[in-house]
Amino acid sequence: MKKNLISRLLKPRLLSRIKNKIRSFFFLDQWTVLLGRDMDHKALAWSDLRTFAPPLDRFWADPFVWLHENQYYVFIEELLYSTNRGYIICLTLDKDLNVVSNQVVLEKPYHLSYPFLFEHEGQLYMLPETKQNNRVELYRCVKFPDQWEFEKALIDNIRALDSTLLEANGKWWLFANIQEEGGSGWDTLNLYYADSPLSDQWTPHPLNPIVKDVYSARPAGQIFIHDGRLIRPSQDCSVDYGYALNFNQIVTLTETDYAETHEHVFKPPLKGGILATHTFNSIDGLTAIDAIQLRWKFE
């Protein structure tokens, strides 16, 4: 009897479960935001990033940076563990990247995350994830940074995750993971196109899903140009949700064809209590990512 008990305890799965149970009693796996200056995607280094951690009752994720009147603002998803419903807040930073204010800027009765920001014809817009409301919703900024009005639904009757817009080749392109009922939201990337970001007539790409791969499908931030090449950040969810960042070069983008190649990966380190990272955004000299970090529960 004693021998059988010892044998069971030594099984890897059971040992792992015991270890995780002990860890979860003392530590919290918390999404946090990290900022750094003048870093492109290939120069990312954990040692050069400064962590901004929320209180222990919530997490911060999906940071998007905006520069307004020479001051940096970081729009992020905040989620209270007690409600499990995300909303959008904005951190206002001083010149030394200290947080001088923190305010809720958009909240709904349903979950919001991934506050994708873009400017069109002098107007600032936000395209947050609104999958829980079964459509892709666009918001217009009426007073920066904390007043946003609903503009329109770009696509109805769709469970879209991490919608990401790009203007290129005379069109506007909308990248998003589409989650079917009961299915995964990690491994299929769909593409839509229109003549304007304000259109409500988005044409599905004929090759949808354009990426079918848990390693690189799900968007991870704004698509950007580096050395003349279009780079699409994506999540590597092969180990777990949002485990690492991939950077993929878009080599073909037309109404009939799409192709991309993997360029670079940025993984969590093997030390320091950093377990995952799944968002990258960089604008005007400030880079923002997020990370799951182990935090002592009894601070």
Placement of each model-derived feature along the sequence:
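Carbohydrate-active catalytic/glycan-binding domains of CAZyme proteins
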Residues: 1-299
